[in-house]
Amino acid sequence: MAELDGIESKLFTARDFRLESGQSLPVLELAYETYGSLSPARDNAILVVHGYTSSHHAAGRNASGKQGRGVAAGAPGWFDGLIGPGKAVDTNHSFVVSVNALGSAHGSTGPNCTDPRTGKPYGPTFPDITMRDIVAAEKLLVDSLGLKSLTAVIGPSMGGFQSFQWAASYPGFMKAIVPSVTAPRSPAGLDRLEALQARLAGDPNWNGGWYYENGGIAKTLEELRFETLMAYGQNEILAETMPDPKAREAAIRANAKAWAQIYDGHSMVTLRKAIGSFDITGDYAKLKNTKVLYVQSPSDKLFDIALSPAYVSDMRKAGIDVTYVELPSNKGHMASHADAALWAPILGAFLKRLQ
């Protein structure tokens, strides 16, 4: 099967982006990648949105020097098992746009970006944002590409939140959404915001949040990342090819250390706040004309699968066409991409029915 090579990270720019809070960002930048070609009728576009600390590098491999901020040279995209020529999201037929969320640290406007009004990083002054703000920014990108509709919005975890929010904010704009390892509302305590803020503030270089010129807080970020990867199921993923537990731990710690050099603590807080306030369960009526392929995994420790039947039942009662799939995966919160083969045929068939 052919692969995607030579992918370039691109940048969309807009001015004076107004947030729900009433505050405005003088400059809005969104990093993104595209795969495949837009049809003459401009009717074959799919939007892919990422999880909490992921990037917009969802598929293929970047051209030399053309990767987004913090993306390792030559690294495959995190949804590479699903996106590409002949794959479930078939780039021979679909034009795929993958975007880095507002507030993230992989090239889009976020706390580590320069505030044009001060010439310094926003840092702790970056305004609070909501999932609605994140999606509204993405809509500007989609509009700039001349897309009048989307076939689907696809995303895991926080990307699933975004897909649900897309359907609620812009009903009828997309034919379907494909949220995975996620829920239509943020479960109580998922954000663990106060604990995160306390951990970050405990770093000796915190300096009231102005750590950029104070040595940074990479050590604390490294510890947080290691804990997150373990909770997400990275140990189980590596176990298939790395039987030695010590070797797995060393590999995960190396991953965490590399990530900590490029990510930003304030981005973690900003996105956690958006995650904590997310809830579209009161907007189900807006999703009546949007098909939903909802994918969960029993091994996911972040989103309790016991809650899924009630979500599905409530959506169906609201008249939403929901297809519900449980993945027999032991990969935890990473199931939808680490075990992509388990549901690739289901996703491929679902998308073909939308064409």
Language-model regions: role of each:
Residues 33-115:
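N-terminal cap/lid subdomain of alpha/beta-hydrolase-fold enzymes
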Residues 301-310:
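Conserved alpha/beta-hydrolase "acid-adjacent" motif
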Residues 173-258:
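Alpha/beta-hydrolase-fold enzymes
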Residues 267-284:
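Active-site nucleophile elbow and catalytic-triad environment of alpha/beta-hydrolase enzymes
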Residues 119-125, 132-152:
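Conserved acidic catalytic loop of the alpha/beta-hydrolase fold
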Residues 294-296, 300:
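Short beta-strand/loop motif that positions the catalytic acidic residue
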Residues 312, 316-355:
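Catalytic active-site module of serine/aspartate enzymes centered on a nucleophile-bearing elbow/loop
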Residues 149-191:
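Conserved hydrolase catalytic core segment
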